[in-house]
A protein has these predicted regions:
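Substrate/ligand-engaging "lid" and interaction regions
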Residues: 5, 9-335
């Protein structure tokens, strides 16, 4: 679970090898509450927890929370409660070998709705939760004018209200792992919570508890989850990464090949931005300017030898030298 070499900048997990880690005895499960029902988390964090549980690690189960109001995704919420689990299909290529493997994820116990199940959620959060996941999108950090501690609307307000309930119930420590694609997402979320706590006048003692007992890590997630499966499930590419910035006061309580705990997220961020995202932007520009077929996929556009050559030349001449200058040549080439 620690970063020990440059090679670990690119943990390639094929979604098939479940033989990682030593099997351990499950003594007391670490219950997780997850805000967000997205297909991304279904094929990312939720799948990782399932894999860890398969080796006997004491992590989970997960209770998923639908924070948005309205009836959309109600069918998905109900489906999360099936003991049969849900499918995740890992489809793509590893080392020039095409793979397609279907897994059944059973780490999710149930799903709740904030507007319907607030009392149950409040009790679960106050007394039983040990870890929080979230993926509510960039706009999910935006506060709402009507937010109140007794009637929160936005995700940060919901989270702060639940944290206050936990504080009043005895205030056990808690680990929060935000998965939103926001730079320094942990720091950003903490800043919002602290400011809102001041506005709500929750008091100095609560503020100190929030600072010392609630661990919020910066994280970076990476995986292409191309398609949802109705009512619940997803299709994803083989490559996956969850880079978590190390907190000296709290160990990440499970291991998985795609999870890396590091003192520095910057190299992972640069690889994602300047190789993966740059490549997508480059291809999108070609697709637009050359008026290529509207339904063309990435695989199809890269089957054009001339375009693939242009992309590889961009990487070789303009991207890889920059990484090499910072001692990341091997990591960038593998990525």
């Amino acid at each position: 679970m620690h970063e020990s070499s440059q090679q670990q900048l690119n943990p390639v997990w094929d979604g098939v090898n479940r033989g990682f880690g030593k099997r351990v005895v499950n003594i007391m499960a670490k219950r997780i509450i997850q805000f967000g029902t997205s297909r991304f988390l279904q094929a990312h964090a939720d799948l990782f927890v399932h894999e860890a549980r398969e080796t006997g690690q004491d992590i989970g189960p997960i209770t998923i929370i639908k924070t948005t109001r309205g009836r959309e995704r109600d069918e998905r919420v109900a489906a999360f409660g099936s003991p049969a689990g849900y499918p995740v299909i890992i489809r793509g290529r590893i080392s020039n070998v095409t793979i397609e493997d279907q897994l059944t994820v059973k780490s999710v116990e149930k799903a709740l709705m904030v507007e319907r199940d607030w009392s149950e959620l409040r009790t679960l959060f106050a007394y039983d939760a040990e870890i929080i996941f979230s993926n509510v999108g960039e706009s999910g950090y935006t506060l709402q004018n009507g937010d109140r501690i007794d009637a929160p609307i936005s995700f940060p307000a919901i989270l702060l209200s639940l944290l206050h309930a936990r504080f009043e119930a005895g205030g056990k420590r808690l680990l929060i792992l935000p998965c939103e694609l926001v730079s320094e997402n942990g720091k950003v979320l903490r800043k919002i919570l602290v400011k809102l706590a001041e506005e709500w006048k929750l008091g100095k003692t609560f503020g100190e508890w929030l600072e010392t007992k609630i661990v919020i890590c910066d994280t970076l997630v990476d995986r292409i989850v191309s398609e949802a499966i109705d009512p619940v499930g997803a299709i994803a590419e083989p490559y996956a990464l969850w880079a978590i910035k190390r907190e000296p006061t709290y160990d990440i309580p499970f291991i998985h090949p795609a999870v890396v705990v590091t003192d520095d997220l910057e190299p992972y961020l640069r690889l994602k931005l300047h190789i993966l995202n740059l490549g997508h932007s480059f291809l999108a520009e070609i697709w637009l300017t050359e008026k290529r077929p509207h339904d063309e996929t990435v695989r199809e556009i890269l089957s054009d030898v001339e375009i693939k050559t242009r992309l590889l030349e961009l990487y070789d001449k303009e991207v890889l030298p920059g990484f090499a200058a910072h001692g990341l040549a091997n990591a960038a080439s593998q990525y």
